[in-house]
């Protein structure tokens, strides 16, 4: 069999390599008279045109296909096959020779070298003898002789092995050759598969270094022998064809170099590692030989070139279409073997470059003849899929082309729209970047492991023996099969690194085989899509397309590979996963997301590791599950959604009366008519997008009470303002109008105040809603100014668009401290605060200030990730209201009705109003919200739009006189409704309402139960429990929203409303959603998700993911469905009668 192998990757003829003087080759050739060889036999496997031309004309770049990145070592364009008979064998030059080079040189070179190395060697061991004098003859004789090569038979191989050892020992002059050498001899004379398996083993770039005979500085590593031998023993035959010669060659060269280069001890520092592990290689080779003997019916192993040809029966490649193979030859197979299967025995790291030597990077477009031939051959011979297999080779730094970034040796596509063909078994694209030093260059060339050498072998699990071949598996990776089966699929466990193809430690992981980096486009898109906290779930990197419109997800062998995955996979996906689907160019129509392909889609996404759910949340979920049952969603296709008739609304088991249906219709009409009169809303997401580059707050004011001249009453006025509104612009005029209203909110009870001597400071807040629906928060601190005797309080108020009560409470603390020293110290502090940036959620900003007597200070202000419970006190809410009354108020707010709270104390109104709004999380109240409404502004309650306001009890008589439209008036002091609409108990789905009520009734019992860890402390409070109970309500009703967010070709996301509503199994929930989806709260929620740029996840998104994983993915059997439908029809007919 004719094989070409250049382990050291020297100069490629005609490929742009560095030219050395022409005399170098002639000095390094040995041309002794050839011994008589057995008659040449034609190869069993047909050689491709490229292989044939490579045998005959190795000097012509246009017809040369280099296998496994091996190139002719001659630096001269002179034909190495024309040695002069008069040339005598000189001493070894050791400049650019490659010690692992196996060329298809004519038999003259081989016979000369054979005679020179081993006098009187047997004729049938010419291949082995030819490998010995390589230090003196640069063109290394291959195992074949003759222009087409000789395939030596396996007959009599073992009979000659002992003689080979004796001759080698005599030639070395030291000691008998090791069993590895005899094994090498056997395999070299045997069939290709027998000498193949040992070739790739010593090519690992590991710390055990074996010197090259060609250069004392070129070293090669051997520490990965055990893993490599394990890989090749488990792989099928086509993988091990051309792997066999490097091992004996290097072993003999090791002894040769040690003998010839004793004056250069630096090359022999770590050369003993290979001998220690030779038994592992022998055992693997013997296994392969044994299999060949036991199963002669399987025939000889296939060429590696045919390993990845398309199997029409099983293998389907879903990238660029399948290729077809003509019956004639394997020319593209040879090219595929040259650039794809190539790196099995290549170097994991490059040796240092010697002066005057260089090599062209194998597989570099434009430099490698094989890469030049490949496109034309592929077009002529479309049957073979040229696999972009990762190469374990090296290159000289001087000849590196920094502009060319090949993917595993494949030539670049003519256009970006046509990426190279991809295999059924994925492999990472190789991006090689220039490095400054030797270590960086070695890292960039190193590969992680050999797990993707054969597609079929990946389906078999590797042996799990931890100490096989005398070495232990690295405990970090777990079992080898788990890593290799799932390396390109769902990364589920907690990996120490964020990317499985980055930052592999040279010593502890795969011994210096760092995985190749992704191509720059894929890597950038990957980093854009995944935030740092989400990268523990790694998307398959090779599934990211370089062009958005290209089909990038491979469908071949999915059913086979997914069987090795972890069993728990999410059945449906959150909104952020839908964003990833759009990035991966998956079809995003509702039909594709709701049909049976949904489960397949879940496997294409990164499977989510099951997060630990707090026990308190589990208890709440169990209450809902007991009330609701198991069925949540219906499996729908677009056709069933579009053709769903009105009869479907009455076909569920939950039969409602006609009166309830009429009430539902009236509510729907009412909310639609009322919202038409409401101002347009602006969601928080949209506001923050506009304001995140602006200041932290808009203005800071100090409000004081001024006595009216005619009466003995006081009016609130702004006594200090920062910044001053100097420019008379439209925005400033609007700000002035707001400033006129702010004193009323700072002192809603101004008429009741009298000067006092003592007063404890009080903190409260309010919200201003503009005509355009924009929100501004007012954070107030009421306190007594410094002085003696009775005096009136004043209020420090900060107006901001940022809803963070805790952050501004810290600001007000600093203001109060400075105001106590001197009012002049407040201005420089507020000025430095206004210059501070707008903080992102979870980020901290630092404000540098100066205080006399204290010096320079730094105030840290942190914006919480989730501020839903800031300034919220559910204890006060449950003190004032019973559970049933609270649920009625909650239902009225969900349908955006008018709600008025009445209480005696300002703090009670403020606390209950903020707490009720917090129950709506993740939704936000989009309409007028005034926790404490000043008596002078009570006319607001007559507006026809939704609102939530709080009134002091002193304003109640006036409230009853006003023509207030339909509204729910609640007396917080007596826990009763002053006015109601009498349908508050029927607004929510009855099963969910029962679960909500039960969970709140048992709140003390649920909190008191033991927690499993300290991390549940946040939940094991009243605030945490109440929030989780209402979050679960929304998860049950709208938790599947992310399944119906689709993305258009332009990247715009849209929500499928009808499909979302009709996918719910429960009719009562569908009716609730029909009304709730008309609200501006729901519209703002969906708009936030459509506009959201980042993948930040709050508590609601986490609970939604857990909920979607819980959903059953089964549907009722056909008979049960038929019987149930028949029963529903009978009920419907009975109603009509």
Swiss-Prot record:
Amino acid composition bias (Polar residues), ranges on this chain: 1-12, 49-64, 456-481, 514-524, 539-558
Keywords: Cell membrane, Cytoplasm, Endosome, Guanine-nucleotide releasing factor, Membrane, Phosphoprotein
UniProt superkingdom: Eukaryota
Organ and tissue specificity: Widely expressed with the exception of peripheral blood lymphocytes. Isoform 1 is expressed in several epithelial and fibroblast (including tumorigenic) but absent in lymphoid cell lines (at protein level). Isoform 3 is expressed in primary cell or weakly tumorigenic but not in tumorigenic cell lines (at protein level).
InterPro entries in alphabetical order: cDENN_dom (IPR001194), dDENN_dom (IPR005112), DENN_C (IPR043153), DENN_domain_containing_2 (IPR051942), Tripartite_DENN (IPR037516), uDENN_dom (IPR005113)
GO biological process, one term: positive regulation of ERK1 and ERK2 cascade
GO MF annotation list: guanyl-nucleotide exchange factor activity
Domain dDENN: 1003-1096
Protein name: DENN domain-containing protein 2B
Organism encoding this protein: Homo sapiens (Human)
């Amino acid at each position: 069999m004719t094989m070409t192998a250049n382990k050291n990757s020297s100069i490629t003829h005609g490929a742009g390599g560095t030219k050395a003087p022409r005399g170098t080759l002639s000095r390094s050739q040995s041309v002794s008279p050839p011994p008589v060889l057995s008659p040449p036999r034609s190869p069993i496997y047909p050689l491709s045109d490229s292989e044939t031309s490579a045998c005959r004309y190795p000097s012509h770049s246009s017809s040369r296909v280099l296998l496994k990145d091996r190139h002719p070592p001659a630096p001269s364009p002179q034909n190495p096959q024309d040695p002069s008979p008069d040339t005598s064998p000189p001493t070894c030059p050791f400049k650019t020779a490659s010690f692992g080079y196996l060329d298809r040189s004519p038999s003259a070179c081989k016979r000369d070298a054979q005679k020179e190395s081993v006098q009187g060697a047997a004729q049938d061991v010419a291949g082995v003898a030819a490998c010995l004098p390589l230090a003196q003859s640069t063109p290394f004789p291959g195992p074949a002789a003759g222009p087409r090569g000789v395939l030596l038979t396996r007959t009599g191989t073992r009979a000659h092995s002992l003689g080979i050892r004796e001759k080698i020992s005599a030639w070395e002059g030291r000691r008998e050759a090791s069993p590895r050498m005899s094994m090498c001899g056997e395999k070299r004379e045997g069939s290709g598969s027998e000498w193949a398996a040992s070739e790739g083993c010593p090519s690992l770039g590991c710390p055990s270094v074996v010197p090259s005979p060609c250069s004392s500085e070129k070293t090669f590593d051997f520490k990965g022998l055990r893993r490599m031998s394990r890989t090749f023993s488990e792989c099928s035959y086509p993988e091990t064809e051309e792997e066999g010669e490097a091992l004996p060659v290097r072993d003999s060269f090791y002894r040769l170099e040690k003998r010839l280069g004793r004056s250069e001890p630096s090359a022999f520092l770590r050369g003993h590692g290979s001998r220690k592990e030779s038994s592992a290689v022998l055992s693997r080779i013997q296994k392969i030989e044994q299999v060949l003997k036991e199963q002669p019916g399987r025939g000889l192993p296939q060429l590696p070139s045919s390993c990845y040809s398309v199997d029409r029966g099983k293998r389907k490649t879903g990238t660029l279409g399948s290729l077809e193979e003509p019956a004639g030859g394997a020319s593209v197979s040879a090219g595929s073997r040259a650039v794809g299967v190539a790196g099995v025995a290549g170097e994991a790291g490059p040796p240092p470059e010697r002066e005057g030597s260089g090599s062209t990077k194998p597989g570099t477009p434009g430099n490698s003849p094989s890469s030049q031939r490949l496109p034309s051959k592929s077009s002529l011979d479309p049957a073979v899929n040229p696999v972009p297999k990762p190469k374990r080779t090296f290159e000289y730094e001087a000849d590196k082309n920094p502009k060319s970034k090949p993917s595993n040796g494949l030539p670049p596509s003519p256009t970006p729209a046509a990426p190279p063909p991809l295999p059924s078994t994925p492999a990472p694209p190789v991006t090689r970047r220039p490095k400054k030093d030797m270590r960086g260059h070695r890292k960039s060339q190193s590969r992680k492991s050999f797990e993707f050498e054969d597609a079929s072998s990946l389906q078999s699990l590797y042996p799990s023996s931890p100490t096989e071949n005398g070495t232990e598996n690295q405990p970090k990776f777990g079992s080898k099969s788990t890593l290799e089966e799932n390396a390109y699929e769902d990364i589920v466990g907690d990996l120490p690194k964020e990317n499985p193809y980055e930052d592999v430690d040279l010593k502890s992981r795969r011994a210096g085989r760092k995985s190749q980096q992704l191509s720059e486009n894929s890597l950038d898109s990957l980093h854009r899509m995944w935030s740092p906290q989400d990268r523990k779930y790694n998307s398959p990197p090779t599934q990211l397309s370089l062009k958005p419109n290209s089909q990038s997800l491979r469908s071949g062998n999915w059913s086979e590979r997914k069987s090795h995955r972890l069993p728990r996979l999410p059945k449906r996906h959150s909104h952020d996963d839908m964003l990833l689907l759009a990035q991966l160019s998956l079809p995003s129509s509702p039909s594709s997301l709701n049909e049976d392909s949904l489960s397949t889609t879940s496997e294409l996404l990164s499977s989510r590791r099951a997060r630990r759910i707090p026990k308190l949340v589990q208890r709440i979920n169990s209450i809902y599950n007991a009330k609701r049952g198991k069925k949540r969603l219906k499996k729908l296709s677009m056709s069933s959604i579009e053709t769903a008739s009105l009869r479907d609304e009455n076909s569920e088991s939950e039969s409602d009366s006609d009166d309830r249906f009429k009430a539902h219709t009236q509510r729907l009409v009412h909310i639609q008519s009322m919202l038409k009169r409401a101002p347009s809303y602006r969601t928080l997401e949209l506001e923050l997008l506009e304001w995140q580059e602006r200041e932290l707050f808009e203005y800071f004011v100090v409000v004081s009470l001024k006595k009216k001249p005619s009466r003995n009453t006081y009016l609130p006025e702004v006594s200090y303002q920062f910044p001053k509104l100097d420019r008379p612009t439209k925005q400033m005029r609007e700000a002035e109008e707001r400033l006129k209203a702010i004193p009323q909110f700072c002192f809603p009870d101004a008429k009741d105040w009298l000067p006092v001597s003592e007063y404890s400071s009080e903190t409260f807040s309010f919200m201003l809603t503009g005509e355009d629906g924009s929100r501004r928060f007012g954070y107030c601190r009421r306190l007594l100014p410094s002085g003696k005797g009775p005096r009136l309080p004043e209020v420090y108020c900060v107006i901001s668009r940022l809803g963070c009560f805790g952050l501004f409470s810290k600001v007000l603390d600093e203001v109060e401290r400075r105001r106590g020293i001197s009012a002049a110290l407040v201005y420089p502090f507020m000025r430095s605060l206004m210059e501070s940036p707008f903080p992102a959620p979870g980020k901290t900003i630092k404000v540098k200030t100066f205080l006399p007597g204290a010096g320079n200070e730094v105030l840290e202000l942190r914006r919480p990730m989730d501020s839903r419970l800031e300034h919220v006190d559910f204890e006060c809410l449950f003190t004032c209201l019973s559970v049933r009354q609270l649920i009625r108020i909650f239902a009225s707010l969900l349908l955006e009705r008018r709600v008025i709270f009445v209480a005696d104390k300002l703090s009670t109104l403020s606390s209950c109003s903020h707490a009720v709004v917090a129950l709506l999380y993740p939704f936000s109240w989009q309409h007028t919200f005034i926790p404490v409404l000043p008596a002078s502004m009570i006319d607001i309650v007559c507006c026809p739009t939704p609102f939530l306001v709080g009134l002091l009890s002193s304003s109640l008589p006036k409230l009853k006189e006003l023509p207030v439209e339909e509204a729910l008036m609640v007396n917080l002091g007596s826990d009763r409704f002053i006015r109601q609409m009498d349908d508050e108990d029927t607004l929510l789905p009855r099963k969910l309402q029962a679960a909500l009520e039960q969970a709140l009734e048992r709140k003390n019992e649920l909190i008191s139960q033991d927690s499993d860890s300290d991390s549940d402390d946040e939940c094991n409070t009243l605030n945490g429990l109440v929030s989780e109970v209402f979050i679960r309500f929304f998860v049950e009703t709208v938790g599947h929203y992310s399944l119906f967010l689709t993305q258009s070709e332009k990247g715009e996301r849209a929500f499928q409303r009808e499909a979302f509503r009709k996918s719910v199994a429960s009719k009562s929930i569908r009716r609730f959603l029909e009304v709730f989806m008309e609200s501006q709260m729901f519209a703002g929620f969906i708009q936030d998700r459509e506009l959201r740029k980042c993948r930040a996840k709050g508590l609601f998104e986490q609970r939604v993911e857990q909920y979607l994983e819980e959903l059953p993915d089964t549907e009722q059997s056909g008979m049960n469905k038929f019987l149930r439908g028949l029963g529903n029809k009978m009920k419907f007919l009975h109603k009509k009668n």
